[in-house]
UniProtKB/Swiss-Prot annotation:
Functional description taken from the UniProt entry: Probably forms vertices in the carboxysome, a polyhedral inclusion where RuBisCO (ribulose bisphosphate carboxylase, cbbL-cbbS) is sequestered. Has been modeled to induce curvature upon insertion into an otherwise flat hexagonal layer of major carboxysome subunits. Has not been identified in purified carboxysomes; it is expected to be present in very low amounts.
Name of the gene: csoS4A
Location of the BMV domain: 1-76
Protein name (record): Carboxysome shell vertex protein CsoS4A
Quaternary structure note: Homopentamer.
Length: 88
C-alpha cells in the first residue's frame, strides 16, 4: 500500500473497451505523479491509501480491470512532516 496526495482529476473520454468510465485522479507518490482509479470519491488535497498490482484490479471492481493503482481509502488525519505518526 502507498500513501499518496490527490493533485487533480484526470478526464479521459476516449478509452479502450473494458476500461469503463471510472473516475481517475492524478496522485503524488513521493516525487512522481501517477494516475489512480478513484474507488472512494476523493478530492484534490486529500491524502489517500492506494493499492497496486492485482489488489488494484480487484479494488477497481474486477480482476481483469486494467489498473495498476487504485485509491481504496481517504486518510482522516495525516501530517507528512510529523516525525512520528499515531497508529490506529
Amino acid at each position: 500500500m502507498l500513501i499518496c496526495k490527490v493533485l487533480k482529476p484526470l478526464v479521459s473520454t476516449n478509452r479502450i473497451p473494458g476500461f469503463e468510465h471510472k473516475h481517475l485522479q492524478v496522485v503524488l507518490d513521493g516525487s512522481s505523479n501517477k494516475v489512480a482509479v478513484d474507488a472512494v470519491g476523493c478530492k484534490p488535497g486529500d491524502w489517500v491509501i492506494c493499492v497496486g498490482s492485482s489488489a488494484a484490479r480487484e479494488a477497481a471492481g474486477s480482476k481483469s480491470y486494467p489498473s495498476d493503482l487504485t485509491i481504496v481509502g481517504i486518510i482522516d488525519h495525516w501530517d507528512p512532516d510529523s516525525p512520528k505518526q499515531i497508529e490506529v
